[in-house]
A protein has these predicted regions:
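Periplasmic N-terminal accessory/gating domains of Gram-negative outer-membrane beta-barrel systems
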Residues: 1-63, 74, 80
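Short sequence motifs at beta-strands and strand-loop junctions characteristic
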Residues: 4-6, 67, 90-92, 132-136, ...
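Membrane-embedded beta-strand positions in outer-membrane beta-barrel channels/transporters
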Residues: 11, 55, 60, 72-76, ...
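Outer-envelope exported proteins of Gram-negative bacteria
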Residues: 15, 112, 155-161, 219-229, ...
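Extracytoplasmic loops and strand-loop junctions of Gram-negative outer membrane beta-barrel proteins
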Residues: 37-41, 58-59, 80-83, 124-128, ...
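Short strand-turn segments of transmembrane beta-barrel domains in outer membranes
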Residues: 42-46, 54-64, 73-102, 110-115, ...
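Transmembrane beta-barrel wall of Gram-negative outer-membrane proteins
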Residues: 94-117, 130-170, 197-222
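Flexible loop and strand-edge segments within Gram-negative outer membrane beta-barrel domains
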Residues: 120, 153-154, 158-213, 228-252, ...
Length: 291
């Protein structure tokens, strides 16, 4: 079973596992997502650019040892190797993107470039918590390949991504109904906010691989990569709330208001989180096809 609990997120769980138990590879390089993200509204673009993808392999268990020791799943992405000049572009309310690919005259050098920009402000503004949402996310990816000879080639994969999220909440109105043989009521909570949240997530990735294919059956690949996450969260929000019975009789002038207060209070959400991760990896992979 593969599922997600939020339509705003690219996180997914497999067979009840956590999202961080899933491995993701792009052209044999392991990629990571921001670590401090706590909700879908903070997320930006996922690492994978669909316009650059050639093939996808997904294993929800029982995968080969070459993929490592994570518990739940493996998502193995292979990007395209262009054979001619081309490209694509798309524009939507939430996201815009441009992809360009091509080769040189002797077909030894190929490039695959992609740039995306996303803002889901229109979607977030329809949530229960009303306020000023300012999300933005952009990334640039490049895959460069050079064929030295029929047996040797080099590949460079790079990604630069930045996501910013600012929220100045104003008001939230929540309602739930309680039914029982002894008591039934419509309980509401009105929350008034002051303060703001400001987050930033910067991701940089650079991977280099040298590929040697001595024969049709044997393929050797040396890889080196660097992955960096620079994240910061700044939250200082005070909420004043009132809860009680909400009036849903449209004939009354108090329609939609709390008419029988049961309690009130104040809470504060405060955070100063910073995280910087730098991951270097050097590896070698070999593949021999007996067929």
């Amino acid at each position: 079973f593969v599922g997600s609990n939020n339509e705003l997120t690219s996180q997914y769980s497999v067979r009840g596992g956590s999202y961080d138990e899933n491995l993701i590879y792009v052209n044999d390089f392991e990629v990571f997502r921001p670590y401090l993200v706590r909700s879908g509204q903070q997320e930006g673009l996922s690492f994978i650019n669909p316009e650059m993808v050639k093939g996808i392999s997904f294993y929800n268990g029982g995968f080969q040892a070459k993929y490592g020791d994570k518990l739940s799943s493996v998502l193995d992405i292979q990007y395209k190797k262009p054979k001619k000049f081309g490209g694509s572009a798309y524009v939507s309310i939430l996201e815009q993107g441009l992809q360009v690919e091509g080769v040189n005259k002797n077909s030894k050098f190929s490039y695959l470039l992609g740039v995306r920009n996303r803002s889901n402000r229109n979607l977030l503004s329809r949530q229960d918590t009303k306020g000023n949402y300012v999300p933005s996310s952009a990334d640039f990816q490049a895959l460069l390949n050079y064929q030295f000879s029929p047996k040797w080639q080099a590949e460079l994969l790079s990604n630069i991504s930045q996501t910013k999220f600012t929220l100045i909440p104003e008001f939230s109105q929540l309602t739930t109904s309680v039914f029982s043989p002894l008591y039934s009521a419509t309980i509401g909570v009105d929350i008034y906010f002051e303060g703001r949240e400001k987050d930033r997530y910067q991701t940089n990735m650079l991977g280099f691989s040298l590929i040697n294919q001595p024969s049709k059956k044997l393929k050797l690949k040396w890889m080196a990569s660097r992955f960096e996450n620079d994240e910061a969260e700044n939250v200082d929000i005070i909420g004043t709330y009132l809860f009680g019975d909400r009036d849903f009789d449209k004939r009354n002038p108090t329609y939609g208001l709390i008419v029988n207060p049961l309690g009130a209070g104040v809470y504060q959400n405060w955070a100063r989180n910073e995280l910087n991760i730098e991951n270097w990896n050097v590896s070698h992979k070999g593949n021999y096809d007996k067929g």
